[in-house]
Amino acid sequence: MKQFRLISPVFALLSVLSAGAANNTFDIDLKKTGAPIQNTMYGIFFEDINYAADGGLYAELVKNRSFEFPNALQGWKTFGNVQVLDDGPFERNPHYVRLTDPGHAHKHTGLDNEGFFGIGIVRGEQYNFSVWARSESPVVLRVELVNTASMGENHFVCQQRLTVNGKEWKQYKVTLRPNETLEKATLRIFMETRGGASVDLEHISLFPADTWKGREGGLRKDLAQALADLHPGIFRFPGGCIVEGTDLETRYNWKNTVGPVENRPLNENRWEYTFPHRFYPDYFQSYGLGFFEFFQLSEDIGAEPLPILSCGLACQFQNDDINAHVPVDQLDPYIQDALDLIEFANGPADSKWGKIRADMGHPEPFNLKYIGIGNEQWDALYPERLEPFIKAIRKAYPNIKIVGSSGPNSEGDQFDYLWPEMKRLGADLVDEHFYRPYEWFLSQGTRYDNYDRKGPKVFAGEYACHATGKKWNHYYASLLEAAFMTDLERNADIVNMATYAPLFAHVEGWQWRPDLIWYDNLHSFRTVSWYVQQLYSLYKGDNVVGLTMNGKPVAGQDGQNGLFASAVREGNQIYIKVANTSDKEQQLTFNFNGLKKKAVMAASKRIDLSSDKLYEDNSIEAPVNIVPVENGFDGKGQTIQAAINPLSFSVFVLTIE
């Protein structure tokens, strides 16, 4: 991701507000079948920014569960006699705590965990606590969820006891069922046994039992459901800038994210410190949400997985020194990582990496079809590193499609340099990114009309409408995204994938906005941009249908009254998407050409997204403040009339009878 200086935030809005109401005739050509729309056309992109993984989609409620943060007790408060040791049972997570009798009957030993901005719990729901532990003699632990802000006689809202008994490390489990709903509870562990006893604790974990698909140690249900409800065709992960790392040592390494969660090593998160004005010193990656879980989620929601791997370049925004990057002649381990990932996803269960997948519970291949190499890279440094990756992958896995990059900008010198390089190298798709202002989105209605159809396909991998002084989610920005997406759809022969970014944000832990889905510890809401994405996905269609006004694409051009439109066909249904970026109601005439003899078009329904609250969105308090509404839509024949509200987006559904 790259930030841009946005200029003239109201220029584009004012430029279309003067458009007057008019009768706009759309000519819709049904004579010939247009370009097929790929199943991957609309999808999602996950990056661990804004506490998207730990504290977000990954449902673990304990922060620093294995005491591996640089400050081993960050997230914890200790009382009594607590030591941190580093010869634990898990090689890549060696730290643990030793609790010892404090030596006085009125003193206590134990520890509290604060969770991620608190621990959200719901009255009557079940929570699964687990810990790896050992002791020389039996030790009783009291496990509690507490409300330290309570004015009641007791802080605890539920408690259970477990007995640690054995010199060898073993996992112990209890269930907790709180009698209150709290957004900011605390997990407390009391050592009750006295007499000089001690107990060692490692990998202390707390999960809701009600996770996505009911998986133990799984995903937060409401957030995963928000992804499934988008019906995405492609799922890009895990980034983004974290793929590169601030330095190569801290890049995202997929091999560290598979296998037992207890032995997945901690990694820093570059979004902890990238923006000093929004600094989060407790933001790390536990890798509990790893590549197996990403592949599994892709399968759950019916999306093709698109993993992105390091090309050997650290973040170029943060590193001017060539020595920060891997020399081209030393790329072999990075290339092998890519080949091994394909084996992990697709290899037989008796192969080296396929066996790890099988041991994790998925003996069948994940049927990986795409892989991305590099993120927002630029200059000759990138293509000279990408080339050996492409050669190696083509040789070993010729059917895998490779995604390259056009860099962080939507136009300019680097963009113009990288596109020919991607063609020369034979990349299958090129990832374009654009976080741009109002006027850019209004000016891009014909962006892809003149792209070379003989080269790589386009992946619009990161985009969102940003506005100076209004860099938050708001309705008008979402409307302009909807307008821009008509160009993606109309050019589906060259644009094969598109994903909004970023995906997730915690209301107390964000570094970047706007974002698609927001949440606190108990609630979540879907933004207006989420509903735009869903409408495009639900009414994706199978093939593009030609739609013009005065012989030109309806793309906000001169004389088109701020209208953007596209049309697709699915069987006997036609879906027409129209964005009205003017402040006037617009009359529409749909003129259908090429209907078979005696066939007519029948209006079925319309879905309208409309609001006069241009700079508002949904929120935790008002999650359905602005949402699409299904309305009636009448008419039958070769010509059908409709109207569209000012500053609104509509999907018109018609049936060929």
Where are these regions (language model features)?
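Catalytic-core region of carbohydrate-active enzymes that cleave or remodel glycosidic bonds
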Residues: 297, 391-392, 398-401, 419-422, ...
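Surface beta-strand/loop "capping" patches
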Residues: 67, 123-125, 543-581
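Extracellular and organelle-lumenal recognition/adhesion modules and their flexible linkers in secreted
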Residues: 22-286, 304-306, 319-332, 339, ...
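Acidic, Ser/Thr/Pro-rich beta/coil linker or hinge segments at domain junctions
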Residues: 597-644
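Substrate-binding cleft/loops of secretory-pathway carbohydrate-active enzymes
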Residues: 316-326, 333, 362-365, 408-439, ...
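Carbohydrate-binding surface patches
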Residues: 560-598, 606, 647-653
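Conserved, mostly hydrophobic/aromatic
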Residues: 44, 131, 231, 298, ...
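Solvent-exposed strand-to-loop "edge" motifs in beta-rich extracellular domains
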Residues: 132-136, 177-179, 538, 579-581, ...
